[in-house]
A protein has these predicted regions:
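Short helix N-cap motif at coil->helix boundaries in the Bergerat
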Residues: 168
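Extracellular carbohydrate recognition
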Residues: 152
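Flexible, solvent-exposed loop segments that connect beta-strands
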Residues: 123-128
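Short-chain dehydrogenase/reductase
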Residues: 159, 175-177
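A generic "structured core" feature
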Residues: 137, 159-161, 165
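Domain-scale signature associated with acetyltransferase and cell-envelope carbohydrate enzymes
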Residues: 1-115, 133, 137-139, 146-148, ...
Length: 177
């Protein structure tokens, strides 16, 4: 974990969180990172963070708050970059096997899923890749229970409506229903 409390670069872990940072994993903090924040006093809903060997997660700019019930997994040699200055509500799931970039001022509602891979499932199609980078630019709003799939590029200011599934290119300042 790379941070500096005196410079405001720290990691706050709340009760009922499981953190696994394997050998050579990196958690780089350029701002405060709050993990597993609870709104309901006494809740035991756990949050999980796994960064496998060679994986890297970086909070780039302003503070980032992840509410309880989160599951963030950064696989071997994968990169997860979060711009900061906002956060995610309860139930965030991020599965990163390649590269996921989330821009500044991007908010996630309840039960949002972001993934850049399909779980290593074998599909017999020439040229098929099991993962593809995801880019979510700044000032994006991912609303309740939406899913961002491998290869998605979401331009600035877009809003992804509740229970939408997104793949491919989403233009700036658009609303996906």
């Amino acid at each position: 974990v790379k941070g500096n409390v005196l410079e405001g670069k720290y990691f706050i872990i709340n009760k009922y969180c499981t953190i696994v940072l394997e050998s050579k994993a990196q958690l780089i903090l350029n701002a405060p990172f709050y993990f597993g924040n609870k709104r309901i006093k006494g809740s035991r809903l756990d949050s999980r963070l796994l960064i496998e060997s060679g994986g890297r997660m970086e909070i780039k700019y302003g503070s980032y708050n992840v509410a309880y019930g989160a599951d963030i997994e950064v696989f071997q040699n994968a990169i997860l970059e979060i711009g900061g200055e906002l956060g995610a509500n309860i139930g965030l799931t991020i599965i990163c096997a390649d590269h996921i970039s989330i821009g500044q001022h991007t908010g996630c509602g309840r039960n949002v899923t972001i993934r850049d891979n399909n779980g290593e499932h074998f599909i017999s199609i020439r040229g098929y890749k099991t993962s593809s980078p995801v880019t979510i630019k700044e000032h994006v709003w991912l609303t309740e229970s939406c899913t961002v799939m491998p290869g998605a590029v979401i331009e600035p200011g877009a809003i992804i409506s509740a229970r939408s599934v997104v793949s491919g290119h989403i233009p700036a300042f658009s609303i996906v229903k």
